[in-house]
């Protein structure tokens, strides 16, 4: 959706409400009946049990004092900004407080993070880790002192990136993460970190590359693609002045979501309502 199309489509609160009503499955929140009085979308009434509720109930817009036009503008900006938007910018553009701007973007990230990634059933995948410190991303060293561990699975042919924050890079954690997202039929490429030693017990096609010997083995094993993917993740975190440790997983999921595909306005809205 282009900017002029967006501006024409969502000029008023009523236009925004109508758009949500068109996307959302409208049923009673108590008895799940579909027979509703929808003359007032902010106060719909079930014709079976008389329950009244808003079309916004259950969405990120519920009980928000911020106008829907502002919310829609933020979502449009969020979609069209590859590496995220600082809350300071949103606060200035919408004329809201920094706290309100952060809360709005946090709600979007939280909903996006709940989307289940696509399970990889076949093909070649690369698995690697990235360590986030207070100074940014640093690949060297696996010490978790003042760092957060992010593990990723990447399949180049489908451009499918899956990320997760783990407590540490021990074998049982890495193996469980891989088993949850890829089939045992996949050809798995990793580096020679000892945490991947048990992968052969599950993935019969597991190959490693020792980075002390080079970036690509003699038979072509490498993790170059996923290591280059970390640049995208790095830029996302650098967009923001500071990211709390307990929110790192949300920003990482946001970055992966945008990396996998350019989401449409409708696709994102369906996640948020």
PLM regions: where:
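Residue-level recognition of single "structural anchor" positions
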Residues: 1-273
């Amino acid at each position: 959706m282009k900017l002029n199309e967006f501006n024409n489509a969502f000029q008023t609160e009523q236009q925004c409400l109508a758009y949500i009503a068109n996307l959302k499955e409208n049923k009673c929140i108590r008895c799940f009946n579909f027979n509703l009085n929808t003359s007032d979308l902010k106060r719909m009434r079930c014709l079976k049990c008389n329950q009244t509720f808003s079309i916004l109930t259950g969405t990120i817009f519920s009980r928000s004092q911020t106008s829907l036009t502002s919310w829609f503008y933020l979502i449009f900006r969020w979609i069209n900004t590859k590496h995220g938007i600082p809350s300071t910018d949103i606060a200035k553009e919408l004329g809201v407080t920094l706290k309100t701007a952060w809360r709005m973007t946090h709600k979007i990230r939280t909903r996006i993070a709940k989307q289940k990634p696509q399970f990889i059933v076949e093909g070649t995948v690369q698995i690697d880790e990235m360590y986030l410190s207070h100074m940014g991303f640093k690949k060297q060293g696996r010490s978790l002192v003042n760092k957060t561990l992010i593990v990723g699975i990447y399949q180049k042919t489908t451009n499918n990136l899956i990320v997760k924050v783990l407590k540490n890079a021990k074998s049982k954690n890495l193996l469980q993460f891989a088993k949850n997202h890829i089939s045992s039929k996949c050809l798995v490429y990793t580096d020679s970190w000892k945490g991947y030693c048990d992968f052969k017990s599950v993935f019969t096609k597991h190959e490693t590359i020792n980075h002390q010997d080079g970036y690509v083995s003699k038979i072509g094993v490498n993790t170059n693609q996923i290591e280059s993917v970390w640049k995208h993740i790095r830029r996302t975190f650098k967009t923001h002045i500071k990211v709390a440790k307990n929110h790192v997983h949300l920003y990482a999921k946001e970055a992966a979501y945008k990396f996998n595909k350019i989401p449409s306005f409708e696709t994102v809205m369906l996640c948020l309502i």
